[in-house]
A protein has these predicted regions:
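A transmembrane-helix-recognition feature enriched in membrane-embedded lipid enzymes
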Residues: 234-256
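Structural motif marking the loop-to-transmembrane transition
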Residues: 47, 54, 58-62, 230, ...
Length: 282
């Protein structure tokens, strides 16, 4: 048996802790890789979450816009239905309309060559028929003459005279810049207290409503001759929805017309004249 010399340094026996440390280091290294892998997965999940969040936000805004669109349609339809219902008893056919002293014809555009637009010509034809049938005695034509080379009123008057209506029974209002302006001026400037409003069927409910709100005992006769023109008719009715909202505002707020002016006696003077023999019935 060899007895080790105490003076000779001895190598330490293998330490199991060294192996454990190596294993822990290896494990830590592996864990770091796993963590790195997890970090990559987390970034991907974050991107996916952001994409889903963006889609949800877009869907939310689209939903809100859809709700607002529906509310706007409802808000527009309520005044439109009010205009229709409040004038249902005051709109008549030409053969059944009550007699009124004055026919009020609303302007509707003039062509560049000076002729009335199709809409306006049909309104004037209907007014002439009422005059010849003895349903009205005077025709008040109201239109836009805000610029020098555009004159709805003179065009309307000339058309009626050419159709056989005596010129002295046609009175012109040159400041009818809107339906509301025309109604207020007919009442305040020309002294009209009752009238038959003549316009297209889609415009008639609003026109009668505004004239009645302006103080005129108004009834209406519609020109329906454009019903075969589907696009024009649909467009006309469609635009009346927002126009009814504006009409409600006029009825509530009662704004002054663009131009009011002094009293004009043209209607009074025309009513004082006797009809020419044979004028009724054309």
């Amino acid at each position: 048996v060899t007895i080790p010399d105490p003076a000779t340094p001895q190598s330490p026996p293998p330490d199991d802790d060294t192996g454990a440390l190596s294993e822990r280091a290896s494990t830590a290294s592996g864990g770091s890789g796993a963590d790195t892998a997890d970090d990559g997965t987390g970034s991907g999940n974050a991107g996916a979450s952001t994409g889903r969040g963006g889609r949800r936000a877009r869907r939310t805004w689209l939903g809100r816009l859809a709700v607002l669109a529906v509310l706007a349609m409802v808000a527009g339809c309520v005044p439109f239905l009010w205009v229709l219902s409040s004038t249902s008893d005051h709109r008549h056919t030409a053969g059944a309309v009550p007699e009124r002293a004055v026919a009020l014809v609303l302007g509707a555009g003039v062509r560049p060559d000076g002729r009335p637009s199709l809409l306006l010509a049909r309104r004037l034809d209907a007014a002439a028929d009422l005059y010849f049938a003895g349903r009205v005695d005077v025709v008040l034509v109201t239109g836009d003459n805000s610029v020098e080379h555009y004159n709805e009123t003179d065009t309307m008057r000339a058309y009626l005279v050419d159709a056989g209506v005596p010129g002295e029974h046609v009175v012109g209002d040159y400041a009818g810049f809107s339906t509301w302006d025309s109604c207020v001026r007919a009442h305040e400037v020309f002294g009209v207290r009752e009238a038959t409003v003549v316009t297209q069927d889609f415009h008639l409910p609003r026109a009668v409503r505004l004239c009645r709100s302006a103080g005129i005992d108004a009834v209406g006769v519609a020109d329906s001759s454009l019903e075969e023109r589907t696009f024009a008719t649909v467009y006309g009715w469609f635009r009346e929805v927002p126009a009814a909202v504006a009409a409600l505002g006029s009825v509530v707020l009662r704004p002054d017309p663009t131009f009011l002016g002094d009293y004009e006696s043209g209607v009074d003077e025309a009513l004082a004249l006797e009809r020419e023999p044979g004028a009724a019935g054309g």
